């Protein structure tokens, strides 16, 4: 009797085991997938595709090793919630940019960034400017695109002149970082403040103005196609350089005196702002007719802070608008 009982028990045990092994296997796809493939799969899910300002299609996936080759772009990337491993020199030396990423390396001056330094940082995303070097140079970061792409490094080119350009840049950056709160704080709220300032512009006033950047070697006049010129246009100002295009190439005090604008805005440029301002003051002092200008007599000859009107003000763009509005209309 005991033998029969033991036999039945053994058969039952085998039956249970058979049922267990006949069940569908657990989903072990993720566990058996190599780590590199898992990372690639996760990256594909986080990938963001966009068109840069040169018309290039760019795709990046949650980049963690980002190099920004212009100070304002480095600042904007951090404002959008990103971190950096490399920046151009001006990101660390120019006033107004407080780079917070730890142990960030430099890749050279933005007018002539070093390709080898960039690649050595093993970036997974490089942010570059589509403009030329400036400062009288003709270098271009666009020339480095082929080398970066052939090295498997995603690179995007941007050009920011107006606030709308900055807003578009921040939208792209925030889409990549996924930090919508950062976009709201450092872009959308700034836009709201600017719209509030613009809504206060008197409809029946259109003051005339000239904007000049001065450096130790001379002076240049800005049109409405520049950063400060665009802000003035938004605030109802008539830029006389738009109507007298020769001023953009050949600046002369005599032309300014003849036009007699209501406002003259001066932006010191270069490493030595004091020397730049002194050069212009010396030139104006030598011309007795300068003091007869309406802008000079009415206290409307204004030197603007380069942090707000030469470098891109980014999250402080509304402050730039406010300074101009107060100068134009706040003292009336």
Where are these regions (language model features)?
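Bacterial Sec-exported substrate-binding components of ABC uptake systems
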Residues: 2-8, 18-73, 180-211, 326-332
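Extracytoplasmic strand-loop-helix segments at the start of, or within, the mature domains
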Residues: 62-91
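Alpha-helical, coiled-coil/dimerization segments enriched in small aliphatic residues
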Residues: 91-93, 220-249
């Amino acid at each position: 009797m005991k033998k029969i009982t033991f036999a039945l028990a053994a058969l039952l045990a085998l039956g249970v085991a058979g049922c267990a092994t006949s069940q569908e296997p657990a989903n072990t796809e993720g566990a058996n997938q190599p780590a590199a493939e898992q990372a690639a799969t996760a990256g594909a899910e986080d990938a963001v595709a966009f068109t840069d300002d040169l018309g290039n299609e760019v795709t990046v996936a949650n980049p963690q090793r980002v190099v920004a080759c212009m100070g304002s772009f480095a600042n904007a990337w951090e404002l959008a919630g990103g971190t950096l491993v490399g920046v151009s020199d001006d990101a660390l030396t120019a006033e107004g940019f407080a780079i917070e990423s730890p142990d960030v390396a430099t890749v050279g001056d933005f007018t002539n960034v070093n390709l080898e330094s960039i690649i050595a940082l093993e970036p997974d995303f490089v942010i570059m400017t589509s403009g030329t070097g400036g400062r009288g140079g003709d270098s271009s970061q666009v020339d480095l695109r082929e080398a970066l792409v052939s090295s498997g490094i995603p690179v995007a080119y941007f050009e920011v002149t107006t606030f709308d350009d900055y807003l578009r840049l921040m939208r792209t950056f925030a889409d990549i970082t996924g930090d919508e709160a950062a976009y709201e704080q450092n872009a959308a709220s700034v836009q709201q403040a600017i719209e509030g300032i613009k809504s206060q512009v008197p409809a029946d006033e259109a003051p005339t103005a000239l904007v000049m950047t001065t450096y130790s070697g001379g002076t240049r006049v800005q049109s409405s196609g520049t950063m400060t010129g665009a802000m003035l246009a938004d605030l109802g100002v008539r830029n006389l350089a738009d109507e007298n295009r020769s001023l953009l190439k050949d600046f002369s005090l005599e032309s300014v005196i003849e036009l007699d604008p209501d406002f003259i805005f001066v932006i010191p440029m270069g490493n030595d702002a004091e020397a730049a301002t002194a050069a212009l003051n010396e030139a104006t002092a030598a011309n007795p007719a300068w003091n007869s200008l309406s802008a000079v007599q009415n206290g409307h000859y204004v030197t603007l802070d380069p942090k707000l009107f030469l470098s891109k003000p980014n999250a402080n763009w509304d402050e730039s608008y406010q300074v101009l509005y107060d100068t134009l209309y706040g003292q009336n």
